[in-house]
Amino acid sequence: LLGLVFTHQFNVDMIVNIFTVIAVIIPIYYFFKILSSQKITATERSRVFAYIPLFIAGVLFWSIEEQGSVVLALFADDQTRLYFNVFGNQIHFPSSFFQSINPLFIMIYVPIFAWLWGKMGKKQPSSAKKFAYGLFAAGLSFLWMMLPGMLFGTDVKVSPFWLIMSWAIVIVGEMLISPIGLSVTTKLAPKSFQAQMMS
């Protein structure tokens, strides 16, 4: 490591690569440790195997959703019109304003989804289907963000509507994955590893 620093080969890209490898290795190691443990029963082991695809789906979703604080923030700053015309007056707002849209949609959607799941009762989709729909919504939110570039080019500042709709779509995915992910983890985690799997 010191040799890399002194030869100027240790840079930000290398740090990102190192952390990416660590982030992949740790869950693999941990699942191997759980599955090979003598503390879990055969039933618990089969539940852990059932949980692994949901864990991977959760990782994919949060990788997409967390782009909002980076990629979409840059899009807001560089490629979004940061003003509204209200009754002939031009109102400017900072690009950081868009970071408040995520929690706003969460507050709007939580009662809607709580009502929906209550209304559907036992007819609601399975946890696996909710995960699939959530991943679809996350992917759709980024496909949506391709449209302004395709329609207007990359040199034009576009309406804030594009970003707002992107967040509206991805937060639907969060409503499907976040609470269900915690619930499924609690149900499928072996008793000996329940706290570790929740964290």
Where are these regions (language model features)?
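Helix-boundary and loop/linker segments of multi-pass membrane transporters
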Residues: 42-48, 88, 92, 153-157
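Short, solvent-exposed coil/turn linker segments
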Residues: 11, 71, 93-94, 159
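Short coil/turn segments at secondary-structure boundaries
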Residues: 72, 87-91, 128-130
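Membrane-embedded alpha-helical bundles of multi-pass transporters/translocases
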Residues: 50-64, 95-186, 190-199
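Intracellular loop-helix junctions on the cytosolic face of multi-pass helical membrane proteins
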Residues: 1-73, 77-83, 113, 117-123
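Short extramembrane helix-to-coil loop segments that connect adjacent transmembrane helices in Major
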Residues: 77-96
